[in-house]
Structures are given as structure tokens and as C-alpha cells.
């Protein structure tokens, strides 16, 4: 196996794991990093989905007791049924729009410059949302994931649709959207984690069936390396983020998004790099 390809797979796996659950857009970072590393062949998008699967496995492991409890309680426990219903409701809008506009989005927006614009716009939205949070005098309306109503779930699901634009961030859209709709910061973060499970599992299955030719003997090793790197880095990131949101807001991520987006634009328009 080519050592350069191994290094690229590991780098992209770590990038995915560190950015999947932060409000900075993992897809945007993978597009920029893949272009910079010249890792953007016909199977690159399949590789990206595979390593996203590695990141979601980290969430499944972190919340394994909760997931087992919900699954085992589905036949008889109302709280498990309500939680599952909320996840399904919140997942439907993004899946529906994604299936309708997938080809157009990938053709028009899956390149570094559109991603950079989305990073900057998303950063500005986070700054605005955090300013609104500071102006609020009343406490959040929803203080537990189990207290979410189907309407709350639908609102978060609609917010998740913004993440179809690469660079906007799925976690950023759901967490910030949830906070604006009255969810406590930690509740919005945890619900965002759970929403990622069906979305990314579905995307992995879809891409696997659609591009099964990519899973050759040579590519399986690279996919496995990227998946493991994404799993480990995502596991560390999830645990860190849960501690972080207990005492901090997302302003630092907003400024990072804006700075990174402007840097990508500067590099592209200055001719220093020819973004693919």
C-alpha cells in the first residue's frame, strides 16, 4: 500500500473525527483537505462517507447504554417510543430534501470556494445566535432530551436542512437551531449527536450500494485506516465537547469558521493554490 495514500487516509480520518460533532462542518473541512491533499478522485466521496461512519460509531459507543435502553424499551416504554419518534421526525426533512437535491448540491457546492462562503455565513449566524442567547433572561424551556416534544424535534429537523449546504455544518445547524428554539445547550448538543446516527448510517448504506465498485481489495485497507482514525478522534472530541458546552458557548467556533473561510478564499483568489 502506498505510504502517501496511507498518510492521506489517516489525516482525513482525523479531520473527520475532530470536526463531525463540532459546529465547524466536517464535510467542508473534508472538501478543503481533500483538495489540498489532491485526494479527490471518483471514490473520494465514498471514502468520506465511510470515515463519517467511523465517527458515528464513536457516538454509538459513548451512548451505548442509552441506545440499548431505548431499543429494548421500544415495545413497552413510552419514553423510549417518544424518543425514537422524535429522532425519526427530526430526520425526515433533511432526508427528503437530500434525496431531491443531492445531485445539484454535489455538482454546484462541493468545492472549496462555496464551502468557504458557507463557513463565513455560518460563523456569522452562530455569533448572532449566541448574542441572542446572552440577551435572554429566562432559562431554556427544554432541559432534558426526554422533555422534547415532536414539534421541537421537527423544528430541529428543519434547521438540520441547512447542513445540506457543505460548510454550514450539521451539528452547528442542529445545536444552534435547537438553542434558538428553547433547548438547553447540552440538550441541543446531545440531541444533535443522536440525530447524526440515522443520517450517517443512511448515507453510508446509500453510498455503499451506489458505489460498491469502490470497495476493492486495495481500497478496503485505506477505508479501514480512515474509519479507525475517525472513530478514535471523534470519541475524544465527543467527550471533550460534552464537558465544554457545560461552561462555554460556541463563539470561538464562530470566529474559527470565519477565519478559516476567509483563509480559503484568500488562498483561492490569490492564486497560491488552485482549489480543485
From Swiss-Prot:
Catalytic activity: di-trans,octa-cis-undecaprenyl diphosphate + H2O = di-trans,octa-cis-undecaprenyl phosphate + phosphate + H(+)
Enzyme Commission number(s): 3.6.1.27
Protein's UniProt name: Undecaprenyl-diphosphatase 1
Primary role: Catalyzes the dephosphorylation of undecaprenyl diphosphate (UPP). Confers resistance to bacitracin.
Gene Ontology CC: plasma membrane
Record's bilayer topology term: Multi-pass membrane protein
Family statement: Belongs to the UppP family.
Amino acid at each position: 500500500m502506498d505510504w502517501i495514500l496511507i498518510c492521506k487516509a489517516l489525516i482525513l480520518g482525523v479531520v473527520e473525527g475532530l470536526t463531525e460533532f463540532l459546529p465547524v462542518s466536517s464535510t467542508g473541512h473534508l472538501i478543503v483537505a481533500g483538495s489540498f491533499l489532491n485526494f479527490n478522485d471518483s471514490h473520494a466521496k465514498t471514502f468520506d462517507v465511510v470515515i463519517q461512519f467511523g465517527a458515528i460509531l464513536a457516538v454509538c459507543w459513548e451512548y451505548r447504554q442509552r441506545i440499548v435502553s431505548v431499543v429494548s424499551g421500544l415495545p413497552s416504554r413510552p419514553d423510549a417510543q417518544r424518543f425514537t419518534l422524535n429522532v425519526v421526525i427530526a430526520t425526515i426533512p433533511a432526508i427528503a430534501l437530500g434525496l431531491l437535491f443531492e445531485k445539484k448540491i454535489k455538482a454546484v457546492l462541493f468545492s472549496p470556494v462555496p464551502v468557504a462562503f458557507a463557513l463565513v455565513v455560518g460563523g456569522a449566524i452562530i455569533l448572532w445566535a449566541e448574542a441572542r442567547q446572552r440577551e435572554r433572561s429566562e432559562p431554556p424551556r427544554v432541559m432534558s432530551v426526554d422533555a422534547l416534544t415532536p414539534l421541537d424535534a421537527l423544528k430541529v429537523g428543519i434547521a438540520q436542512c441547512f447542513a445540506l449546504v457543505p460548510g454550514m455544518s450539521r451539528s452547528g445547524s442542529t445545536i444552534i437551531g435547537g438553542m434558538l428554539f428553547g433547548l438547553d445547550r447540552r440538550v441541543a448538543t446531545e440531541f444533535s449527536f443522536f440525530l447524526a446516527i440515522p443520517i450517517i448510517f443512511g448515507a453510508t448504506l446509500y453510498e455503499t450500494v451506489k458505489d460498491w465498485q469502490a470497495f476493492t481489495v486495495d481500497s478496503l485497507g485505506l477505508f479501514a485506516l480512515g474509519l479507525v482514525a475517525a472513530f478514535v478522534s471523534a470519541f475524544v472530541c465527543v467527550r471533550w465537547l460534552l464537558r465544554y458546552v457545560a461552561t462555554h458557548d460556541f463563539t470561538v467556533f464562530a470566529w474559527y469558521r470565519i477565519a478559516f473561510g476567509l483563509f480559503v478564499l484568500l488562498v483561492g483568489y490569490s492564486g497560491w493554490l488552485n482549489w480543485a
